[in-house]
Amino acid sequence: MESTIQQRLRITFAKGEEIKYISHLDLVRVWERTLRRARVPLAYSRGFNPRPQIAFAAPLPVGFTSRGEVMDVVLERRISPYKFAKGLMPHLPPGLELLSVEEAYPKLPSLQSQVRSAEYRVTVAWDGSREEMEGKLQELLSAEELLRQRRGKDYDLRPLIEDPVSYTHLTLPTIYSV
């Protein structure tokens, strides 16, 4: 089966609570099925086992939700991003939400090579004051190293925090305010 690239669409989607416990490979299969049900003219790889040409920016860990997952879909026939989105919406399973569809230049570097960082939002149960939480956060961010042991090996997580200034925003629910 020979396929020619006619169009590449960049899709931004949300992975919600309903599907946060499915693996990345299962998510890929869900997207493949959804695109097939919507009769999207997917381009396929060459070879003995042709696969739809779908590429994700980065796998999301199991148990995480996201409002900014990105994937590229290669089509063998041109279709407007609006028509693509409109045709896909009724076939999306609960937990997947289409946020945007844009045309992407077919020769762009892969999504995986373009990922530079990720931003996480963490909810922490806290029964102390706002000032105590801010102090703990500043203590964490001013540490020279943040060691974590995994599989018997120590890792320093501190170099992975790029911009501590952006992490100082703190919102506590009203039940915790003093």
Briefly describe each language-model feature range.
Residues 9-14, 118-124:
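Short glycine-/aliphatic-rich beta-strand segments at the starts of folded cytosolic domains
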Residues 27-41, 86-94, 138-142:
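Short, intrinsically disordered, mixed-charge
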Residues 43-75:
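Short, charge-patterned binding micro-sites
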Residues 135, 145, 150-159:
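Long, contiguous binding/interaction regions
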Residues 168-174:
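Conserved small/polar residues in nucleotide/adenosyl-binding loops
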Residues 79-86, 128-136:
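Short, conserved charged micro-motifs
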